[in-house]
């Protein structure tokens, strides 16, 4: 299972990681902390098509969840999304240590 997760992580794009990182920094890590899609789109300034494509991918691999029922949909990091961000941070720290040596 961890091999599958590693493979999914390797295939993330810069846009994918940016959205995951933005949600992580803004602590959108639970349904009740979800943030409006429009707020995220305004902040990241991706094209509408690219933003939609990226969200669809992240939702399909269960890294983000969508809260519906209000006027506007909201997004949050799922447990898998949180693990992905934490793993990316960990790998970044390991790479920094290697560069220092």
UniProtKB/Swiss-Prot annotation:
Signal peptide: none annotated. InterPro entries: WH-like_DNA-bd_sf (IPR036388), WH_DNA-bd_sf (IPR036390). Keywords: DNA-binding, Plasmid, Plasmid partition. GO terms for biological process: plasmid partitioning. A DNA-binding protein that is part of the type III plasmid partition system used to ensure correct segregation of the pBM400 plasmid. Binds the plasmid origin of replication, probably cooperatively, forming a ring or short helix with external DNA. Its effect on RNA expression has not been shown. It comes from Priestia megaterium (strain ATCC 12872 / QMB1551). The gene is tubR. One of its GO terms (molecular function) is DNA binding. Homodimer. Dimers bind to DNA, forming a protein-bound filament which may form a helix around the TubZ filament. This is DNA-binding protein TubR.
